[in-house]
Regions:
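Beta1-alpha1 glycine-rich phosphate/pyrophosphate-binding loop at the start
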Residues: 1-73, 157-203
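FAD-binding core/adjacent interface of flavoenzyme oxidoreductases
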Residues: 72-168, 175-181, 250
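FAD-site-proximal beta/loop scaffold in flavoenzymes
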Residues: 120-147, 243-307
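C-terminal auxiliary extensions adjacent to catalytic cores
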Residues: 345-389
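Internal hydrophobic alpha-helix adjacent to the cofactor/substrate pocket in enzyme cavities
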Residues: 175, 304-330
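Short glycine-rich anion-binding loops that position phosphate/pyrophosphate groups of nucleotides
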Residues: 12, 40, 107-110, 255-257
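A Rossmann-like FAD-binding core segment of flavoenzymes
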Residues: 29-33, 70-86, 97, 175-271, ...
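Glycine-rich, N-terminal phosphate-binding loop of Rossmann-like dinucleotide-binding domains
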Residues: 93, 106-107, 240, 253-254, ...
């Protein structure tokens, strides 16, 4: 009996389960265990909807049913360590799991303390984010009560989950303020360390998005690396010494991997197989660091967690001698960008193309917003339904 351990039951981990089931490989002699802190996850693109007021926070979590996870061992707990030599995983209750193959899909977590003053500003209510369910609820309340002044959207550091999220958030905030008939009272801007939005998408989508921001009266300021926040003065201080004041700050939190191997930092993987430098260990999704053929980092986005799961699952089965077929990570990806008024644009293409990706944005439409809604509905039905995945 070969033991497969999957860390994380989010989009990546669940996709691994689905890929193994659909592989056609007999599962009788495979012992599959998935570990997760609470077996509740969400699609990241639903959080801006909560901030905008289109969804309630408690409607966002997706909890896989027992039927959907039938035949899979489930352990609720946190991972505190991985020993790649002994091939064991240590959990918060000090118990250990041994494995023949390990797939790490634990994602990224918010790390506000990495920027001095940020946590204090958030505690005071002057700074909010929408990178967690609770955070999105806080941002919703803050924007609902905001009617005049300087509203600053800030990308505190790179990398971060969902490349379009900061700009989508600014567009939806503008949409909300217009709906409240107070948009003319608000100075709305975005600051980011990026040269332009979506740099991993190539040279075209970013300028398109900047123009979309400008069309909505949102100022874009690239190449601004955050140094610290002054909570008393309500000021962002950048690395070059420049500053911007705010009445309300909506920020993308600093990110760090939820789980890593032997130290800290994102887990480097082979850009084709998703295998780490350790035999029998793969990493996928947000926790993995993938460099595309053009030298750009692969975005931390749900589609690439799914693509990585497909490649890793096939390679695990081959590694365990259950299949002759390996898998390679696909660079084909897409994302939707809500622009307001229940309309969305889409960026889609091959992030592995050379000499660089050539992603462009489509014109916003209501049909693309509905497509985005359908994507969540289909994923939710797959895992919450009685029929399972």
């Amino acid at each position: 009996m070969k033991k497969i351990v999957i860390l994380g039951a989010g989009i990546g981990g669940l996709s691994v389960i689905n890929e193994i089931r659909e592989s056609g490989v007999p599962l009788d002699d495979l012992d599959i265990t998935v570990v997760d802190e609470d077996f509740a996850h969400f699609l990241g693109f639903t959080l801006p909807w909560v901030m905008r007021g289109w969804r309630e926070a408690d409607s966002v979590p997706i909890r896989p049913s027992a039927q959907a996870l039938s035949g899979i061992n489930t352990i609720t707990g946190s991972v505190t360590g991985i020993d790649p030599i002994a091939r064991t995983v240590t959990l918060s209750d000090t118990s250990t799991l041994s494995f023949d193959a390990l797939i790490i899909s634990t994602g990224a977590r918010n790390a506000l303390d990495k920027v001095p003053g940020l946590a204090e500003s958030a505690a005071r209510g002057d700074a909010v984010h929408y990178y967690s369910v609770a955070g999105a609820g806080d941002a919703r309340r803050a924007l609902a009560n905001f009617s005049a002044g300087k509203l600053v959207f800030l990308v505190t550091s790179q990398p971060f989950r969902c490349p379009v999220a900061p700009y989508e958030g600014a567009l939806l905030a503008s949409d909300l303020l217009s709906e409240k008939d107070v948009r003319s009272n608000v100075d709305l801007s975005v600051y980011t360390p990026e040269l332009h939005p979506m740099p991993s998408a190539g040279p075209y989508a970013g300028p398109q998005l900047v123009q979309l921001l400008r069309d909505n009266g949102i100022a874009f300021h690239g190449e601004h690396r955050t140094e610290r926040i002054d909570p008393d003065g309500k000021v962002v201080v950048f690395a070059d010494g420049t500053t911007v004041s705010f009445d309300l700050l909506v920020f993308v939190p600093p990110h760090e991997p939820s789980v890593t191997i032997e130290g800290s930092g994102w887990i480097d993987v082979d850009a084709e197989t998703m295998q780490t430098r350790y035999d029998g260990i793969w990493a996928i999704g947000d926790t993995a660091a993938v460099t595309s053929p053009s030298g750009k980092p692969l975005p931390k986005a749900a589609i690439f967690a799914k693509n990585g799961a497909k490649a890793a699952a096939q390679n695990v089965l081959r590694y365990l001698g259950r299949s002759d077929r390996g898998g390679a990570l696909s660079g084909l990806g897409y994302c939707y960008l809500d622009t307001g008024q229940h309309r969305a644009a889409q960026g889609k293409g091959d992030f592995f193309s050379l000499p660089h990706p050539a992603i462009t944005l489509t014109e916003p439409s209501s049909s693309q917003h509905h497509d985005k809604q359908d994507e969540e509905s289909q994923w939710r039905a797959m895992w919450e339904s009685r029929s399972g995945a």
